[in-house]
């Protein structure tokens, strides 16, 4: 674990309160990390607090149903499918959709293997739009 940078003036308790406050304002974990880095001069929460932002939020009562990276990929796939409904001959975007859905399936396989997702969970493009909205 890296040492706490000397320019970080906030105490670990203040940083933790800030993380919870930013999450209650609707920011995702990656947005919280960017805000801490850019506006508060905290380069890495794991170096300062010894745990990740998601672990801090789970400890403070926030439970994530799905991992953020998986949800972001599903949102992209849903948006591309909507685009392809209007532009069915866009073959380059079809290729992009195939690649994104391949990433989704690989992530689902990884998360089911590590017990983050339930054993029988499958990605279904028809229900994906309901999942992200």
Curated annotation (Swiss-Prot):
Keyword terms of this UniProt record: Ribonucleoprotein, Ribosomal protein
UniProt keyword annotation of NADP present: no
Highest taxon above the source species: Archaea
One of the Pfam families matching this protein, by short name: Ribosomal_S13_N
GO biological process terms, semicolon-separated: translation
InterPro entries for the chain: Ribosomal_uS15 (IPR000589), Ribosomal_uS15_arc_euk (IPR023029), Ribosomal_uS15_N (IPR012606), uS15_NS1_RNA-bd_sf (IPR009068)
Alphabetized SUPFAM superfamilies for the sequence: S15/NS1 RNA-binding domain
Stretches that traverse the bilayer: none
GO cellular component, one term: cytosolic small ribosomal subunit
Keyword Ribosomal protein: yes
GO molecular function (one): small ribosomal subunit rRNA binding
Entries under SMART domains matching the protein: Ribosomal_S13_N (SM01386), Ribosomal_S15 (SM01387)
Subunit details: Part of the 30S ribosomal subunit.
Family: Belongs to the universal ribosomal protein uS15 family.
Entry protein name: Small ribosomal subunit protein uS15
Gene source species: Methanosphaera stadtmanae (strain ATCC 43021 / DSM 3091 / JCM 11832 / MCB-3)
């Amino acid at each position: 674990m890296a040492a706490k940078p000397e320019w970080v003036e906030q105490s670990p308790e203040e940083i933790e309160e800030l993380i919870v406050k930013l999450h209650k304002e609707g920011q995702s974990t990656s947005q919280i990390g960017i805000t801490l880095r850019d506006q508060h001069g905290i380069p890495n929460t794991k170096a300062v607090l010894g745990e990740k932002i998601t672990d801090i939020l789970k400890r403070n009562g926030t439970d994530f149903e799905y991992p953020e990276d998986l949800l972001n990929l599903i949102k992209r796939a849903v948006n591309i499918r909507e685009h392809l409904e209007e532009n069915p001959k866009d073959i380059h975007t079809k290729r992009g959709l195939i690649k994104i859905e391949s990433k989704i399936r690989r992530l689902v396989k990884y998360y089911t293997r590590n017990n983050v997702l339930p054993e029988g969970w499958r990605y279904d493009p028809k229900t994906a739009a309901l999942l992200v909205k």
